[in-house]
Regions:
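Short beta-strand element of the alpha/beta-hydrolase
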Residues: 67-76
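Primarily recognizes the serine-hydrolase "nucleophile elbow" in alpha/beta-hydrolase
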Residues: 122-180
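N-terminal cap/lid segment of alpha/beta-hydrolase-fold proteins
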Residues: 19-65, 113, 178
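Short, solvent-exposed loop/turn and secondary-structure capping segments
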Residues: 37-38, 82-84, 153, 179-180
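Catalytic nucleophile-loop/oxyanion-hole region of alpha/beta-hydrolase
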Residues: 82-84, 89, 104-138
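Short beta-to-alpha linker loops that shape the active-site pocket of alpha/beta-hydrolase fold enzymes
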Residues: 76, 105-109, 173
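A fold-wide structural signal in alpha/beta-hydrolase
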Residues: 69, 95-102, 166
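Bacterial Sec-dependent N-terminal signal peptides
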Residues: 1-22
Length: 180
């Protein structure tokens, strides 16, 4: 009984210490490139979304930051984003480790591979711009499935100020070659 009470109090204190997420527009003055998608964003089952044309970054600041931050790129085959199970659902765990966590809602490529990559790079820039505010020293990028492909591409095809300090890849797509 004491163990259940202790675990319940721990869960409640963790929930109370969690900070509210902050959502930022990735490109408040308009994105530098376009994916050509003009149809409205669609909310699909299980909090998946498609037709993303206005990317955002949702930040979950750690209550007791350790200096690390992770930008998560949800997967979805570059046609939709699995925002919960490959994004928002992991925020509490990362925050409990002292890691500021951010979920990137990136634009679909729609034949323009540079579009999601520019969103990933901009997310890293934004995290660094707010480094003092969120007590960040290192910014990493993480992704699952197609998001893992995007994360690894962002980590290897960077420009000044967009190179992540580390990467975490969950079952990433490593080839777009469908012949194998």
């Amino acid at each position: 009984m004491k163990r259940i009470l202790l675990m319940s109090l721990l869960a409640i204190s963790t929930a109370l210490s969690a900070q509210k997420p902050v959502e930022l527009e990735l490109w408040p003055d308009g994105a530098p490139n376009s994916n050509g998608i003009t149809t409205p964003e669609q909310k699909l089952e299980n909090n998946r979304i498609s037709n993303v044309s206005e990317p955002t970054l949702t930040i979950y600041p750690a209550a007791k930051p350790n200096g690390l931050a992770v930008v998560a790129c949800p997967g979805g085959g570059y046609i939709r984003l699995a925002m919960n199970h490959e994004g928002h659902d992991m925020a509490d765990w990362f925050n409990a480790q002292g890691i500021t966590y951010a979920v990137l809602k990136y634009r679909m490529p729609n034949g323009h591979h540079d579009v999601p990559l520019s969103d990933a790079h901009q997310a890293i820039r934004l995290m660094r711009e707010h480094a003092n505010e969120w007590h960040i020293q290192k910014v990493g990028i993480m992704g699952a499935s197609a998001g893992g492909h995007l994360a690894s591409t962002a980590a290897t095809h960077y420009t000044a100020g967009t190179r992540p300090d580390f990467q975490i890849l969950f079952y990433p797509v490593i080839s777009m070659d469908l012949s194998n």
